Amino acid sequence: MARRDRVIITIGGTGVGPRNRTPEATEPHIDTLLPGLMTQILFSGLSNTAQAGLSRGLVGLSSRDSTAALIVNAPSSSGGVRDALGVVCPLFGSIFERL
C-alpha cells in the first residue's frame, strides 16, 4: 500500500479450509471494518448458493482519511468475485467522497 492504492481486492483464501488465511493476513491493514458491505456481499452470494455462507471475507478501510484504501476479500469462485464486485464497485465514489 506504499503507492497509495485506493482499492485492494484479494481473490481467494476466504473459506474454512486450513490454508484459507486471507482475512487473517489483511485484517492488520484494516483500520475500520465495513460490516454492512460484508453483509451485502453475503446476501448477494446467498441468493445464488448456500456455500456463500462459508466465506469469511472482510471489507474495510485502511484509514479514515484521504489516504485510505478500500480492502475487499472476495472468494475464489467467479460467482463470489462477481458478488463482491457487484456490491462494492457502485459504492467507490460514495466511499471516497466521505474521506
What are these model-predicted stretches?
Residues 1-99:
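Non-catalytic beta/alpha edge segments that cap or flank active sites
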